[in-house]
């Protein structure tokens, strides 16, 4: 065969392989959604998070190997399969979804994780977190002039826009509520503030808000991602709500911080929608 013709056949074969199948992650490769985790939390020494894994076959094997980042010396991390029973090894939109759970412990003031290395189906796989995971240890508060009574600790990302989430507080002493916000990724939307069950306005209208000893305060709001941020309604988001207040006879502000875990997948419909979104 003419060398030029043979070389042309090689180029055509390589082009066909590239365009038809060799680079088709949706049919051939395992997908781990490292770009769909947003985690910035102030919490305890023990913490955890989830990633979603999509495979074209059931019974995916996963083993945690290591992680990289900042201040990770002494960090321990274990892998658990957190997949719900109703989607475990169930074919959805032609693929299978595994919810990867990671249980961590640190003695450091903060940890930042940039990547996680896993053994998936006997293949070493490095999962890059497009947004580094940041976990900061919560400092004990010496003031309880205002305390939390209710907050949504576990929610679903795809319910952000159609759910009014309640955040309740009780004032033991006279205080000024300075601000209410989320520490990262998201913002409150369509808020209503109630004092002793009476609506008094939105966050923008009434904060800073003076409250008296014995008052019950509730903030109802929807949640939305910050403008111009790249996210999906199937993103795992872990963050804190933060109420900043100033109690009488105190020289500094105090902050009430509560954990919020927003999961991407809560049922088979969510799992199928996530798989379709990544196709």
How would you label these PLM feature ranges?
Residues 119-199:
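Surface-exposed beta-loop interaction hotspot
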Residues 44-49, 107-115, 161-164, 236-239:
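Short, solvent-exposed loop/turn segments enriched in Ser/Thr/Gly
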Residues 2-8:
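Bacterial N-terminal signal peptides that target proteins for export
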Residues 88-102, 213-224:
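Aromatic sugar-binding surface patches on proteins
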Residues 18-21:
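C-terminal motif of bacterial Sec signal peptides marking the signal peptidase cleavage site
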